């Protein structure tokens, strides 16, 4: 019934198995991949005919984690998986980025890749396995895919590279780098690092590329057994049309791409395009070509004009040379009520970045296959349509916004202070108000400034820069601080963020084969120069964290109480802690180890809450005087609440000097009194006295009398 084929190799000290022919047999390609006890299913289906009216590759990649893979039931009311989580969105992009450039030009068939996590062993993150499985399924599917690709995660522990570190090793690593590519070239890099050098980062990329070669060989071996016949793809020769169009509009297109201002340039290019379309579609005549085809040729011609100009003259669209960074204006403290804010402008790219400090109540609970954890640093990136002069629908967060936000998050996280030293929840929001390339790196620069403006003690300021590449045969140009057009028309998008000490984040997407180690080395070196320059410009606004927190930010005080006192502080059903919060106005968070965090923007509120909590968590001392409230009046005395939630008895004989007939003659419920702790009886009950305390001044009368009695003797002795 099943026509199974499988390949198994040892990879990084664990078995990797790829199997096809048993599950999801109606898909064009389906592979079950197993690494350790982590299992994923990758499927590929491509439509039989091209999608009409599109001039792009209609590829969709969906990665989904099923909670049953970890032996869990989803939370929430419906008890089933809902919309994609941030992790699922990020891994979907991780799979998409290296496979998209490998589809044949002209492939317009709707193609869907779905990767489902079936089992998670809590050691091997499914994302790398998902990339491998998707590559294998595409290779088997018959779609015009110029793969396969391999992928690997690289760590850096004790000055050594580690292939596919397990989850328990991740806290120890100074680097988390994911690299993917073909047998000949690196296509994609995603990483977070603790201020590592360019040499270490490049070494990690090449280490990963070398070590996923056995995976590529395994996929090829599986394809030799089970791959479907390649789909036929008719490639149309447009060279004659391109030659005719070049003669018609070359000079005007070159002139348009010499206009430095984006909106003016787009208007000029639009007029040239109208001229080309009018030429190929004369009024009153039957069209000889498809409009999308002519538009596609024009787009190719745009790319060639820009690329030729850069390689021939060394000048870019806006007149810069390859190494120059656009003019920068950095401002901090631009919003009066925000805890921290910055406006970072680089050329025609601008980010308004705002930092908000919160408490433990504001931490984000993340429910993942590996378990639930709390995230104390959040960075959100918003890209409204007005930032590029367009209209558009505002709705849910798009995949691109999630991806760019995570890139900036990775760049900033390594320089944040440890949570035990700075116990705040930090949320950074980057609003892209203008965009012409490198908005994610503008977010990094703005985030660094906004955090320092809020008083967050970063290890060092952090900046980011986007690099590009033009490669034609043996000639190439590495471009610093690329424009949007240079991103779209170039061969590489290479984003580097870090401090003056080293790199904190590196993201690379390469659209072509042939990017050598030497080219990447040049790009990293040029990126470092650009990063140092940007840090210098940022320092004109703010070069270190402000000494005080933002005026409107909450203050947090941290202290510890004995763990056996936690229950008393919280109270039955949370009664006591709710009362503390309501009456003091402070937020209180108590952790299992007895760590207490008290937060408020009002210092007096914090002091009152701390005093209250400490009075509950510590024991009263015999002989000390305390303020209290009469809570119950009895014939034999009065019960007084003192020292937080503690109650003690003032016996009728201890209410006042002289004989007291009735307790109610001296006190009534609600009275504020001063009491001295006499001690505890045989049953542990607290004994208090009002008689020995001056109710006006709180003075200890016994101690006063004793001192007065000793004074004459002391005088005589002298």
Curated annotation (Swiss-Prot):
Statement: the UniProt record of this protein carries the keyword RNA-binding:
yes
Residues involved in Mg(2+) binding: 487, 493
Q: Pfam families from the xrefs?
A: KH_1 (PF00013), PNPase (PF03726), RNase_PH (PF01138), RNase_PH_C (PF03725), S1 (PF00575)
- Entry keywords, A to Z: Cytoplasm, Magnesium, Metal-binding, Nucleotidyltransferase, RNA-binding, Transferase
Domain S1 motif: residue ranges: 623-691
Name all KH domain ranges.
Answer: 554-613
Catalytic activity annotation = RNA(n+1) + phosphate = RNA(n) + a ribonucleoside 5'-diphosphate
Q: Where is this region: Disordered?
A: 694-718
Name the InterPro entries for this protein. Answer: ExoRNase_PH_dom1, ExoRNase_PH_dom2, ExoRNase_PH_dom2_sf, KH_dom, KH_dom_type_1, KH_dom_type_1_sf, NA-bd_OB-fold, PNPase
Q: Name one GO molecular function term.
A: polyribonucleotide nucleotidyltransferase activity
Q: What is its main location?
A: cytoplasm
Gene Ontology BP term (one) = RNA processing
Which cofactors is this protein said to need? Answer: Mg(2+)
> GO CC annotations?
cytosol
The reply on keyword Heme is no
Assigned EC number:
2.7.7.8
Location within or outside the cell: Cytoplasm
Q: Which PANTHER family match?
A: POLYRIBONUCLEOTIDE NUCLEOTIDYLTRANSFERASE (PTHR11252), POLYRIBONUCLEOTIDE NUCLEOTIDYLTRANSFERASE 1, MITOCHONDRIAL (PTHR11252:SF0)
**What does this gene product do?**
Involved in mRNA degradation. Catalyzes the phosphorolysis of single-stranded polyribonucleotides processively in the 3'- to 5'-direction.
* Family in the record: Belongs to the polyribonucleotide nucleotidyltransferase family.
Q: Which NCBIfam families match?
A: polynuc_phos, PRK11824.1
**Can you name this protein?**
Polyribonucleotide nucleotidyltransferase
Organism from which the protein derives: Rhodopseudomonas palustris (strain HaA2)
């Amino acid at each position: 019934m099943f026509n199974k084929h499988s390949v198994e190799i040892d990879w990084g000290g664990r078995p990797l198995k790829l199997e096809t022919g048993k599950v999801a047999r109606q898909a064009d390609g389906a592979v079950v991949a197993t690494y350790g006890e982590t299992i994923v299913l990758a499927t590929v289906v491509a439509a039989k005919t091209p999608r009409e009216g599109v001039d792009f590759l209609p590829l969709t990649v969906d990665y989904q984690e099923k909670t049953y893979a970890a032996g869990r039931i989803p939370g929430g009311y419906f008890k089933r998986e809902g919309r994609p989580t941030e992790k699922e969105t990020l891994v979907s992009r991780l799979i998409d980025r290296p496979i998209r450039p490998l589809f044949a030009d002209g492939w317009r068939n709707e193609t869907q890749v779905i990767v489902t996590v079936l089992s998670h062993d809590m050691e091997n993150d499914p994302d790398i396995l998902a990339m491998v499985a998707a590559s294998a399924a595409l290779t088997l599917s018959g779609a015009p895919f110029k793969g396969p690709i391999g992928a690997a995660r690289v760590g850096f522990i004790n000055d050594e590279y580690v292939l596919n570190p397990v989850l328990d090793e991740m806290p120890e690593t100074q680097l988390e780098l994911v690299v993917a590519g073909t047998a000949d070239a690196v296509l994609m890099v995603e990483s977070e690092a603790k201020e590592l050098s360019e040499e270490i980062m490049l070494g990690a990329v090449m280490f990963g590329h070398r070590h996923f070669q056995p995976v590529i060989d395994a996929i090829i071996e599986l394809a030799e057994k089970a791959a479907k016949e390649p789909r036929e793809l008719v490639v149309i020769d447009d060279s004659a049309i391109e030659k005719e169009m070049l003669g018609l509009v070359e000079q005007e297109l070159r002139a348009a791409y010499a206009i430095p201002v984006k909106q003016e340039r787009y208007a000029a290019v639009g007029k040239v395009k109208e001229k080309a379309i009018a030429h190929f579609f004369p009024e009153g005549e039957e069209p000889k070509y498809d409009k999308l085809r002519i538009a596609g040729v024009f787009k190719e011609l745009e790319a060639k004009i820009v690329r030729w100009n850069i390689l021939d003259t060394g000048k870019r669209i806006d007149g810069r040379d390859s190494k120059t960074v656009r003019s920068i204006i950095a401002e901090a403290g631009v919003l009066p009520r925000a805890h921290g804010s910055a406006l970072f402008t680089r050329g025609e790219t601008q980010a308004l970045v705002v930092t908000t400090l919160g408490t433990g109540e504001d931490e984000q609970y993340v429910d993942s296959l590996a378990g639930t954890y709390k995230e104390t640093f959040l960075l959100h990136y918003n890209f409204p349509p007005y930032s590029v002069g367009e209209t558009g629908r505002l709705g849910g967060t798009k995949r691109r916004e999630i991806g760019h936000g995570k890139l900036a998050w990775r760049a900033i996280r390594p320089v944040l202070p440890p949570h035990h030293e700075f116990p705040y929840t930090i949320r950074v929001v980057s609003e892209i108000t203008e965009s012409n390339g490198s908005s994610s790196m503008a977010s990094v620069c703005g985030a660094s400034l906004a955090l320092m403006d809020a008083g967050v003690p970063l290890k060092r300021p952090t900046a980011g820069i986007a690099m590009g590449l033009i490669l034609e045969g043996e000639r190439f140009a590495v471009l610093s601080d690329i424009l949007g057009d240079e991103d779209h028309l170039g061969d590489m998008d290479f984003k580097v963020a870090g401090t003056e000490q080293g790199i904190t984040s590196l993201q690379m997407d390469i659209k072509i084969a042939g990017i050598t180690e030497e080219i990447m080395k040049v790009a990293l070196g040029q990126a470092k120069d650009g990063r140092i320059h940007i840090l210098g410009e940022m320092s004109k606004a703010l070069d270190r964290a402000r000494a005080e927190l933002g005026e409107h930010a909450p203050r947090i005080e941290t202290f510890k109480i004995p763990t056996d006192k936690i229950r008393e502080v919280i109270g039955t059903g949370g009664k006591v802690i709710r009362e503390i919060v309501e009456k003091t106005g402070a937020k209180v968070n108590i952790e299992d180890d007895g760590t207490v965090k008290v937060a408020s923007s009002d210092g007096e509120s914090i002091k009152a809450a701390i005093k209250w909590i400490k009075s509950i968590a510590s024991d009263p001392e015999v002989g000390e005087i305390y303020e209290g409230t009469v809570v119950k009046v009895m014939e034999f005395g009065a019960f007084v609440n003192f020292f937080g939630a503690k109650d003690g008895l003032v016996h009728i004989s201890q209410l006042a000097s002289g004989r007291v007939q009735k307790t109610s003659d001296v006190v009534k419920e609600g009275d504020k009194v001063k009491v001295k702790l006499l001690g505890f009886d045989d049953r542990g009950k607290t004994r208090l006295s009002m008689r020995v305390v001056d109710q006006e001044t709180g003075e200890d009368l016994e101690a006063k009398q004793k001192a007065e009695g000793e004074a004459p003797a002391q005088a005589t002795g002298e």
